[in-house]
């Protein structure tokens, strides 16, 4: 299954049923009054979050979604049946835009959250509605109204609290695989990870925290170079970034600056997101070389630098302890510890991701 995080679809609500012209025709009422029923309302198109979905792949096979039309009215003042709504299931984290205007219609983050994107047309009025003192036998009715139709752009942004970033081959996939039960593809060449991977890690006391291994970024990523900004958007909802650096690289400091530059150029506050800087692959360094490198980095970037070997599983306890501390401080700093940018918009009635959980 492909990881698809963008799609365009067309939605069309149902037309309202027509009202009808009818009169009472009973045995002892040969000239009864008007009795034409109203048409039923057309069905609406509604998006609904299915937390089991992880991709927008299905929308690349089906682009047009239509709700049912309402039924025409009936005699004896019977209202026509309403058209059935069309429910479209989307993954959590789906942002919905009006293609024509670019307006954000909704940000769907919660299980079973819904968003009305095309309202069904009203049913037409039957001739009974037009009965008055001046017209005791109206012989006209109104047709149903057309339902709303619009083009939508869907954009999936992963719901992860902790994002693992770094240049290709920094060891991001290895790290998420040892911290969680996720099993991403791992190999010794750049861009092994071509899709984001999710893993759930449980702190000593608390619910699981979702980590996302974001595919390797390179210089110019914000302009679409390499894997490009297609995956930078998935960092936007994170609360904390783990900036992973290959300690065996030619110039680890330059690698750090490269990623920071891309975050700043992309915008959306990514460069200001809380970060934990981590040197990986320290099992390949001599102790004195590691000490020198760690000290040089800390003096240049003015922040603590953690040292780990994901493959040897060393230094992970200290790193996790720091992660839990950072998240706890973020919780205390805000009354609402939800993902940045999540929530409904006021006034408006993805190969497969790897997932794992570890205790």
UniProtKB/Swiss-Prot annotation:
UniProt enzyme class: hydrolase
GO CC, alphabetical: cytoplasm
Pfam families per record: GTP1_OBG, MMR_HSR1
Entry annotated with the keyword Cytoplasm: yes
Family that this chain belongs to: Belongs to the TRAFAC class OBG-HflX-like GTPase superfamily. OBG GTPase family.
Residues noted as binding GTP in the record, renumbered to the chain: 166-173, 191-195, 213-216, 280-283, 309-311
Enzyme Commission number(s): 3.6.5.-
Residue ranges of domain Obg in the record: 1-159
Domain OBG-type G: 160-328
Function: An essential GTPase which binds GTP, GDP and possibly (p)ppGpp with moderate affinity, with high nucleotide exchange rates and a fairly low GTP hydrolysis rate. Plays a role in control of the cell cycle, stress response, ribosome biogenesis and in those bacteria that undergo differentiation, in morphogenesis control.
GO terms, biological process: ribosome biogenesis
Subunit structure, interactors included: Monomer.
Location (main, coarse): cytoplasm
Record has Signal as a keyword: no
InterPro entries: G_OBG (IPR031167), GTP-bd (IPR006073), GTP-bd_Obg/CgtA (IPR014100), GTP1_OBG_dom (IPR006169), GTP1_OBG_dom_sf (IPR036726), OBG_GTPase (IPR045086), P-loop_NTPase (IPR027417)
Entry keyword set: Cytoplasm, GTP-binding, Hydrolase, Magnesium, Metal-binding, Nucleotide-binding
Compartmental location: Cytoplasm
GO molecular function: GTP binding; GTPase activity; magnesium ion binding
Name the UniProt record assigns to this protein: GTPase Obg
Required co-factors: Mg(2+)
Protein source organism: Cyanothece sp. (strain PCC 7425 / ATCC 29141)
Residues annotated for Mg(2+) binding in this entry: 173, 193
